[in-house]
Regions:
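Aromatic- and glycine-rich beta-strand/loop motifs that create alpha-glucan
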Residues: 1-22, 170
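Membrane-helix interface segments
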Residues: 16-18, 89-95, 170-173
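Junction motif at the cytosolic side of a transmembrane helix
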Residues: 17, 235-257
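Hydrophobic alpha-helical membrane-insertion segments
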Residues: 22-26, 101-117, 177-199
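Secretory targeting signals
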Residues: 28-69, 95-166, 211-237
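Transmembrane helix segments
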Residues: 31-39, 167-208
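Hydrophobic/aromatic residues in alpha-helical transmembrane segments
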Residues: 64-67, 76, 80, 115, ...
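Transmembrane helix boundary and interhelical loop/hinge segments in multi-pass membrane proteins
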Residues: 67-90, 257
């Protein structure tokens, strides 16, 4: 397994998109910080910091792309045959891809968190990161919680993207499905709230689980909408992620080479 993970990491970090897309996101982060410094009445640096200067939103798209191509490209270029000829089991191959994506996603989040801290110190250093008010948590805690909620919700999207990418031949389809799933929460949130109010069991659907990204920093407000406590959202996300990844393993084992 260790050898497979090293090989997958090598292939991932050899791709230009692995570096180009994060660099683009960093440029966007820097741009928002500069705009916030110049036009504080339009761009709120505190709110921008909480969202990692928008990096926590963009990173989801980055990981959807990586998840959609990590499987489909193996079959597109026929490199999957080389792995199978070396007597690696299909389960080991696909699990190594999961681990590689986990490693990459952790690195990316850590990089964006560090850059967010640096940008805050440069452009808004006079504002305390650790000061608590009576009704609000500190800026640092808010940013870290947002990162955690986004990370969990992102993996829910990624697990579905991996499943679609394993079933379909085109990575474009899985990318589209992942992006639609990501935006679906905000698009149908009003409708979903009405449905959950009428049939409370619907609250366990995967779209509602995506609300962990916002509820994690404002539990009192959003639990009235999701009808779920924060720990229930974490458990629900974990269960759905495991289910989707297990289905990916099953689909991968049955996929024709």
């Amino acid at each position: 397994m260790g050898t497979l993970v090293k090989q997958e990491c090598f292939k991932l970090f050899k791709k230009k998109s692995t570096y180009i897309l994060p660099i683009i996101i960093i440029i966007i982060m820097l741009s928002l910080a500069i705009l916030g410094n110049q036009y504080s009445d339009v761009f709120n640096l505190k709110e921008s910091f909480k969202g990692g200067f928008s990096s926590f939103s963009w990173v989801v798209f980055l990981m959807i792309i990586q998840a959609s191509t990590i499987i489909s490209m193996e079959f597109h270029y026929g490199t999957i045959k080389n792995l199978l000829y070396r007597n690696y089991s299909r389960t080991s191959i696909i699990v190594s891809k999961f681990i590689t994506l986990l490693i990459y996603s952790l690195i990316i989040f850590l990089v964006f968190i560090i850059i967010s801290l640096l940008l805050h110190l440069i452009f808004n250093g006079e504002t305390s990161l650790t000061e608590h008010s009576k009704n609000h948590i500190s800026l640092l805690n808010s940013m870290l919680l947002t990162a955690l909620g986004t990370f969990v919700g992102m993996w829910l999207v990624m697990s579905l993207t991996l499943l679609i990418s394993c079933i379909m031949k085109s990575p474009g389809v899985s990318i589209a499905v992942g992006i639609v799933f990501y935006f679906a929460v905000s698009i149908i949130s009003g409708f979903l709230t009405v449905v959950i109010d009428k049939w409370e069991w619907v609250k366990w659907n995967p779209l509602n689980m995506m609300n962990i990204m916002v509820q994690i920093t404002d539990n009192d407000t959003f639990k009235k909408i999701t009808k779920l406590e924060l720990h229930e959202l974490f458990i629900g996300n974990f269960i759905y992620i495991v289910i989707f990844l297990v289905l990916v393993v099953v689909a991968f084992k049955k996929k024709n080479v």
